[in-house]
Each structure stands twice: as structure tokens, then as C-alpha cells.
Amino acid sequence: MIRNPMSDIDAILITGPTASGKSALAVELARAHDGVVVNADSMQVYDTLSVLTARPSETDMEGIPHHLYGHVPAGQAYSTGVWLREAAALVAQLREEGRTPVFVGGTGLYFKALTGGLSDMPDIPTEIRSRLRERLLAEGTDELYRELVLCDPTAAESLSSQDGQRIVRALEVIEATGQSIAAFQGKTGPVIIDADRARKIVVLPDRAVLHQRINGRFEKMLAMGAEAEVKALLALGLSPEMPVMKAIGVSQIAAMLRGEMTRAEVLDTGAAATRQYAKRQMTWFRNQMDESWERVSP
């Protein structure tokens, strides 16, 4: 139980590393504040990977409404901007109903966008987006990066030559608008959540406890059907550059399906990758979340 609940709040924000117990805390606080849980994790939006992304089950939800989970097809382009628009519409609806949105997830950028706004990026025609993503798959990042250097050197200088998703995004913007993506990144859209009227919690467990949870969790995921999920995902034939293909466990389980890894190796490498990801999250939260965020160690 979290101590010292605040009064007169209109939103609750909960973040923390993977396997920290934040989803259960969200349900607890949603129940206490007549709230609704809203996903703020960039991988839990996809419909294909329920087990592998640790999306809350019906049992986990305990009868509390949960939104923005599993509603995006794996092959569909999805961005922080799209999530923010969906979150804004949901917050407006919940405020009309007098209910408290309880945002929970490990994607730090989502929380920064909620409370600080996001660059007002232009809409990209589907034809342009599809064509460039097909080119990324067919030609690779090096070729598209060389093209970006020629047409938008400012954007190219700020990106890794191997960051396929961001290279494509920059090319999309300049083709659709004739302007560099940098011109839009300086324009900030509306703030959805007033940080001063939100209860903000970052869950930071003891490292040893977190590692123990992660080790057991990955094994449980395999037992619950993660292998079948990855098999279904691979059957879609998506580009390896699509965000959903980069979910932790996908590459390891795919290797097992190809006969290149044993189950034991999948457990070891999957858990190791999850621990590394949790470490990066912990570092980011400690550096980015100021003193207004309540630190909790479960």
C-alpha cells in the first residue's frame, strides 16, 4: 500500500521498470480513486503480444476498466503522437464522467508528452509511409540514410545511420511537407495532464528483487504461450524494423523456432535482455523524473 495519498488530484501517473509491480499498484489506486487504468507502455498497445509484453490479464484487472491495451495491429505504424491523441480523447471523456485516469507503463516518453506536450508533427499520407517502409525492408537503413543526408542533412546529423524507424520518419516528413523534421520538432502541442495536479509515482525496486522477478517472469511467459505468440507474429511477415518485432523475447524465441537456440538458452538470453532493459529504464527514470515524482520501493 502506498502511503500519504494526495487529495484534489485529477490524474495519477505511475511508471517504473519492467516487472516492478506497477500494474498492480495502478489497479489498487484506481480502485481507491474511482479511476480507470490507461496504458502508457509502447509495447502493450499491440494486439499480438499479450503474454510477452506482460499485458494485464482479466484477472489482473480485478474488474477495473483498462484502456489503450492491445488495440493496435502489429503491422500498423504507431507513434507517441498517435498515443497522445488517443490518451487526450480518453482523458476528456473520463473528466466528463468524473473519473480519474491512472496512467501506468514503462515508456518514459509517454509521460513526458502527457505533462510537457509533444512536437506537433504533421500527418503523413498512407501512400508515402507505406512506400518508405517497404523501401526500408528492401534496401536497408544505409541506403535510406544516404538519401536523408542529401535531402535533409540537419536531420541526418542528429540520427544514427542504423536507426531505421527515425530515418524513415524524417524522410516521410520532408517528402510530405517539403520541410525538415527539425522545423516541426520545435513546435510543442498541448499539455494533456497538469503535472501540478497529478500524483506522480516512480516504482524503483531493489535491484536483487527486480532481477529475481525478471528471471521467474520470463520462464512463466514461455509456459503461458509466448512461443505461440511469436510464431503468430512471424507469420505476418513484418519488417524486422517494425517496433513490435523489437519486443524483448521475439528474437530469442524466433531463434528457438528456427532451431538455433535451446529453450534453456532462450530463458537465459531473454532474462538477460530484460535485466539490461530494466537497468536502462532505472537510469532514465532517476535522471529524468524530478523530485516531484514520489519514489516507491515495493
Swiss-Prot record:
It is an enzyme of class 2 (transferase). Residues 41-44, 165-169 are annotated as: Interaction with substrate tRNA. Pfam families: IPPT. Its EC number is 2.5.1.75. GO terms for biological process: tRNA modification. Substrate binds at residues 18-23. ATP binds at residues 16-23. It catalyses: adenosine(37) in tRNA + dimethylallyl diphosphate = N(6)-dimethylallyladenosine(37) in tRNA + diphosphate. The record marks 107, 129 as: Interaction with substrate tRNA. The keyword Membrane does not apply. Keywords: ATP-binding, Magnesium, Nucleotide-binding, Transferase, tRNA processing. It comes from the Bacteria. Its cofactor is Mg(2+). InterPro entries: Dimethylallyltransferase, IPT, P-loop_NTPase. GO terms for molecular function: ATP binding; tRNA dimethylallyltransferase activity. PANTHER family: TRNA DIMETHYLALLYLTRANSFERASE (PTHR11088:SF60). Monomer. Catalyzes the transfer of a dimethylallyl group onto the adenine at position 37 in tRNAs that read codons beginning with uridine, leading to the formation of N6-(dimethylallyl)adenosine (i(6)A). Belongs to the IPP transferase family. HAMAP family: IPP_trans (MF_00185). This is tRNA dimethylallyltransferase. It comes from Rhizobium rhizogenes (strain K84 / ATCC BAA-868). The lineage of its organism: Bacteria, Pseudomonadati, Pseudomonadota, Alphaproteobacteria, Hyphomicrobiales. The gene is miaA.
